[in-house]
């Protein structure tokens, strides 16, 4: 007899209902819960799966390169990056009529195509790629790499190639290798690519496999390096009149500190970026030699942590016990990693537009808006995941004895103070911000806009002035030509930086006013409320006054039956579930703010944002409604245009989002009755009743239905805004 799915759980495999399928899928990756799982086997399976993950990423990036080389217009775009729209790939759709074929035939293509808004064209151009041939080579290389990684994943599941548990628990060696190898050497390699390939290409000198050993990246070669005259590599940088990709106005410097942006491409100087990556490489390669391994020199992580004890003795045991707690909990490690990566992802969103690293990215407005929105949403999901795994750590891995009196135990002991302070901050921000907005709406509605409460963000303006922004007239630090920092930086990076920060055409330190002050505090409300829900979920995951034995019920439970009132909605999973709604809400405000503010900057008129962003109707009418006008006319009784696919996707996103409520608002009894009725009808319908199944159909559990609802809500929400963002931006700027 064939073994039933899931093989990893005998109990589930023998379940006579459809619960077998849904719970099987839900727990397929929860390796800890599988039959016969040992700690060593757990680590080995996760380690092997990392290779599969990387293989998928390489396959995906290979596909991007391949489709652009095959169906894109990269070589044409390179000739005129500002006026030719980059093509992602062709569209073949039997539904297209002649009007659609004409509307979607763009960018010099011979048939319908999708326009790229991911920034890959700008990235490839900046790093020195110029031909389709090079894109194909990159694609094939990544495809081979994906195959190698799949093989490596399989290999590390074979008994003789499975690392031992002690190898996974060797924190110092792993830290050294990740610091020196992953960050250090890869940054050094990237510096090498920029210096040897990208910078020469930006000056009109092609470097390929045929000449890379003979073309010197710098006229003096390695002589300045070995003689200690490193400043030679910064001398004679590209001039302000340099034409990117040509020798006109080019210099010979390879590692500079110019500051600001290349006037033509509006991106950071390539030579500045090479210098940055070299510095990162040096720092991280040094850091990767700091921790003690078999050689007996360097720091011991355990000793560092155990030395961190508060001096007076009245603040507990400090960091004692943390080494083993972190090292023995995969959920703790994953929580830390997700928190870091989520924060970095949000920083990427902020820096991609304010300090654009890729040539001509700053002039491709739809791509800038897409990259910002994409990275902020990804960051939100990742950071929610950090708290989810933090909560699972508290439920499954936390040992009160091993952490007695240390900082972790003290956080749990003080959870009421932590949660109530977050609650107070959220309430304060919410009522005051909403109060200001609503007051402004009322006086607008009653015809006295001069009675609005408009608060200038003076502290933020003062900080901007300290960094060199002169428009506010503070005359302080870098905005004062006679201050010590201004005088110290004159010969280095300061002239370029000051020109950048005071330009009206880029997004470096935007000029801010009362509308910014209000939306900043609205976003602060969202961030603090999301954090409140997540922190409360994690700190109450083991138990609370209401339910002291909560940890015995696991990470996600619906409630403890009808006999124990008030135990619904208090599992750590429920906190994650609720927090995701707040996270989406907050990032909605963040992306609305970014987009509306930038539409004004890109169109050369910031008055609409400044005047309408101080009251709620301004946001609804002058941002959302006004910018959806082109979108909802993508197709109408008079025909269609190239925004029609986004108009349709806008509707489809709403549909997915709305479907979520069907799962969120109804509980399992309703579905069970419906399923039984459908099964009854199925059994009595000719032809249909030839199809039989053994499992008795049962409704999803409450927790599963919430997950399905949350997924629909999230996907629909993001998809709806994606369509709005791309259509409203590309509709204005082409």
From Swiss-Prot:
Please state the protein's primary subcellular location.
plastid
Q: Which residues bind [4Fe-4S] cluster?
A: 559, 568
User: An example Gene Ontology cellular component term from the record?
Assistant: photosystem I
Pfam families, per this entry? PsaA_PsaB
Chain residues that bind phylloquinone = 671
Query: Where along the chain is chlorophyll a B3 bound?
Result: 662, 670
Q: Where in the cell is it found?
A: Plastid, Chloroplast thylakoid membrane
A single MF term (Gene Ontology): electron transfer activity
Topology in the lipid bilayer is annotated as: Multi-pass membrane protein
Matching entries from Gene3D superfamilies are given as:
Photosystem I PsaA/PsaB (1.20.1130.10)
Q: How is the cofactor bound?
A: P700 is a chlorophyll a/chlorophyll a' dimer, A0 is one or more chlorophyll a, A1 is one or both phylloquinones and FX is a shared 4Fe-4S iron-sulfur center.
A biological process term (GO) from this entry: photosynthesis
- Read off the InterPro entries from this record: PSI_PsaA/B, PSI_PsaA/B_CS, PSI_PsaA/B_sf, PSI_PsaB
| Positions that bind chlorophyll a B1 | 654
Q: Which NCBIfam families match?
A: psaB
Write out the similarity annotation.
Belongs to the PsaA/PsaB family.
The name of this protein is Photosystem I P700 chlorophyll a apoprotein A2
Q: Which gene encodes it?
A: psaB
């Amino acid at each position: 007899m064939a073994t039933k799915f899931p093989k990893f759980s005998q109990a589930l495999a023998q379940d006579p209902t459809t619960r077998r399928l849904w719970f099987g899928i839900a727990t397929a990756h929860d390796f800890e819960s599988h039959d016969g799982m040992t700690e060593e086997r757990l680590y080995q399976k996760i380690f092997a799966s990392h290779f599969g993950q990387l293989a998928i990423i390489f396959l995906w990036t290979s596909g991007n390169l391949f489709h652009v080389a095959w169906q894109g217009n990269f070589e044409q775009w390179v000739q005129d990056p500002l006026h030719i729209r980059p093509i992602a790939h062709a569209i073949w759709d039997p539904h297209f009529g002649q009007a659609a074929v004409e509307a979607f035939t763009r960018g010099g293509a011979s048939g319908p195509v999708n326009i790229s808004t991911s920034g890959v064209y700008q990235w490839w151009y900046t790093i020195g790629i110029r031909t389709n041939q090079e894109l194909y080579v990159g694609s094939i290389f990544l495809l081979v790499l994906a195959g190698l990684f799949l093989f490596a994943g399989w290999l590390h599941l074979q008994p003789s190639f499975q690392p031992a548990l002690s190898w996974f628990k060797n924190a110092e060696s792993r830290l050294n290798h990740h610091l020196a190898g992953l960050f250090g050497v890869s940054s050094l390699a990237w510096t090498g690519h920029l210096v040897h390939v990208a910078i020469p290409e930006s000056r009109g000198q092609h470097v390929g496999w045929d000449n890379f050993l003979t073309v010197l990246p710098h006229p003096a070669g390695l002589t300045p390096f070995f003689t200690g005259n490193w400043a030679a590599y910064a001398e004679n940088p590209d001039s302000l009149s340099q034409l990117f990709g040509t020798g006109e106005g080019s210099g010979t410097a390879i590692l500079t500190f110019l500051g600001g942006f290349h006037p033509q491409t509006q991106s950071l100087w390539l030579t500045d970026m090479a210098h940055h990556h070299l510095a990162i490489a040096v720092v991280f390669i040094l850091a990767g030699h700091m921790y003690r391994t078999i050689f007996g020199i360097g720091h011991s992580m355990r000793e560092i942590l155990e030395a961190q004890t508060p001096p007076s003795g009245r603040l507990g045991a400090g960091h004692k016990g943390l080494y083993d707690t972190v090292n023995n909990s995969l959920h703790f490690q994953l929580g830390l990693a997700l928190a870091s990566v989520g924060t970095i992802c949000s920083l990427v969103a902020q820096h991609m537009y304010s300090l654009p690293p890729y040539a001509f990215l700053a002039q491709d407005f739809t791509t800038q808006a897409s990259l910002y929105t994409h990275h902020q949403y990804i960051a939100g999901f990742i950071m929610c995941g950090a708290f989810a795994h933090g909560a699972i750590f508290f439920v499954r891995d936390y040992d009160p004895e091993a952490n007695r009196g240390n900082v972790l135990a003290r956080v749990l002991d003080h959870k009421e103070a932590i949660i109530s302070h977050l609650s107070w901050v959220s309430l304060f921000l919410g009522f005051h911000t909403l109060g200001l907005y609503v007051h402004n709406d009322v006086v607008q509605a009653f015809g006295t806009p001069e009675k609005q409460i408009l608060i200038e963000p003076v502290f933020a303006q003062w900080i901007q002035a300290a960094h060199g922004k002169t428009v506010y007239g503070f005359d302080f630090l870098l905005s004062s030509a006679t201050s010590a920092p201004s005088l110290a930086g004159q010969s280095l990076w300061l002239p370029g930086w000051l020109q950048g920060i005071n330009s009206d055409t880029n997004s470096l330190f935007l000029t801010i006013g009362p509308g910014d002050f209000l939306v900043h505090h609205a976003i602060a409300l969202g961030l603090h409320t999301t954090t409140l829900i997540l922190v409360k979920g994690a700190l109450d995951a083991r138990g609370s006054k209401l339910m002291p034995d909560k940890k015995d019920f696991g990470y996600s439970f619906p409630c403890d039956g009808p006999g124990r009132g008030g135990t619904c909605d208090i599992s750590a999973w429920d906190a994650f579930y609720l927090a995701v709604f707040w996270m989406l809400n907050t990032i909605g405000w963040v992306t609305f703010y970014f987009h509306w503010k930038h539409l004004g900057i890109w169109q050369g008129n910031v008055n609409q944002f400044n005047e309408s962003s101080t009251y709620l109707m301004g946001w609804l009418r002058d941002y959302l409604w006004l910018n959806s006008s082109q979108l909802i006319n993508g197709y109408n009784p008079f025909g269609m245009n190239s925004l029609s696919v986004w108009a349709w996707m806008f509707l489809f996103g709403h549909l997915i989002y709305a479907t979520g409520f069907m799962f969120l608002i109804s509980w399992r009894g309703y579905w069970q009755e419906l399923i039984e009725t459908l099964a009854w009808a199925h059994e009595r319908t000719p032809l249909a009743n030839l199809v039989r199944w053994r499992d008795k159909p049962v409704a999803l559990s409450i927790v599963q239905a919430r997950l399905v609802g949350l997924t629909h809500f999230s996907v629909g929400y993001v998809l709806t805004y994606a369509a709005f963002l791309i259509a409203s931006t590309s509709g204005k700027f082409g």
